[in-house]
Amino acid sequence: MHLARFPRRFIAHLPTPLERLDRLSAELGGPEIWIKRDDCTGLSTGGNKTRKLEFLMAEAELQGAEIVMTQGATQSNHARQTAAFAAKLGMKCHILLEDRTGSNEANYNHNGNVLLDHLHGATTEKRPGGGDMNAEMEKLADEWRADGKKVYTIPGGGSNPTGALGYVNCAFELLAQANDGGLKIDHIVHATGSAGTQAGLITGLKAMNAQIPLLGIGVRAPKPKQEENVYNLACATAEKLGCPGVVAREDVVANTDYVGQGYGIPTESGMEAIKMFAELESILLDPVYSAKGAAGFIDLIRKGHFKKGERVVFLHTGGAAALFGYDGAFDFSSRWVG
């Protein structure tokens, strides 16, 4: 599969590490756990969206854009990485931040990813939750274009066929690492939200005939909607790659049992996952996305979903910067001993 024919801005630190998690594996007593460290992509604390932005921002440059506009939730990792990428390329960035939680916490609204958005020079504006954010963004972009501004819009999560190419590439990268290290991967698990990561991964895996089951742990939409979104995007991505029909509907699997009360609202199991990964492996998760993916992964291990001795890769999508917007979700009073 010749990805080099697509414009790309090489910014990410790739390949990201593929590591075995011995202490977490021993603690859970199930499969042999490995982690693909896409929290280490290098741009402004890293994260999965940088892979997508390599292709999206290259397209923006080719179109002569002066401003990139995107949207996401208040503590959006995607927004932060877009702001950082734009700064790196000397472009302006404007972000529409959707209030999906109703939180009035100062750190949630001004710290974490929001602080980094502004540090990278982005301008932001808030929008109420529940609207069609991509449509609102396009409406605003059209108004700016009418004033003569050259605006390139990026959908939430960078999730369109161009952005999904970043995770087609990740699938190729992961398979190459496994082949070089003699690692037979039995399953891949990751958090899934805006659909681009899962769509790109499954397209890349199927294009390479890898035959590795891929499971997305949902963080927002119900299962039927999540799987529909991923499948439709995977089909469009495969079409763009020149391998239409390579992804079947049954290849797209999401488990949405770990969303909790809603997107961006921490769960008890997610907080447990954050503490387990931090205390056992010194790896940081975030309450919005990676922690819910890890919580589902941990629960499925405990329920025997994966066989003992199987090798399962958890793809870490990053997001640790959001921890500083959720300090109120933690209670470490017992850790103070003096």
Curated annotation (Swiss-Prot):
Q: Describe what upregulates or represses it.
A: Induced during growth on sulfolactate or cysteate.
Concerning InterPro entries, the annotation shows:
ACCD_DCysDesulf, D-Cys_desShydrase, TrpB-like_PALP, TrpB-like_PALP_sf
- Give residues where N6-(pyridoxal phosphate)lysine occurs: K49
Which top-level enzyme class is recorded in the Swiss-Prot or TrEMBL entry? lyase
MF-aspect GO terms: D-cysteine desulfhydrase activity; L-cysteate sulfo-lyase activity
Q: Which organism is it from?
A: Roseovarius nubinhibens (strain ATCC BAA-591 / DSM 15170 / ISM)
**What are the protein's UniProt keywords?**
Lyase, Pyridoxal phosphate
The UniProt record lists the keyword Lyase: yes
Protein name as it appears in the record: L-cysteate sulfo-lyase
Question: EC no.?
Answer: 4.4.1.25
Source domain of life: Bacteria
Q: Which reaction is recorded as catalysed by this protein?
A: L-cysteate + H2O = sulfite + pyruvate + NH4(+) + H(+)
Which family, according to the similarity comment? Answer: Belongs to the ACC deaminase/D-cysteine desulfhydrase family.
The coenzyme or cofactor needed here is:
pyridoxal 5'-phosphate
Role played: Catalyzes the desulfonation and deamination of L-cysteate, yielding pyruvate, sulphite and ammonium. Involved in sulfolactate degradation.
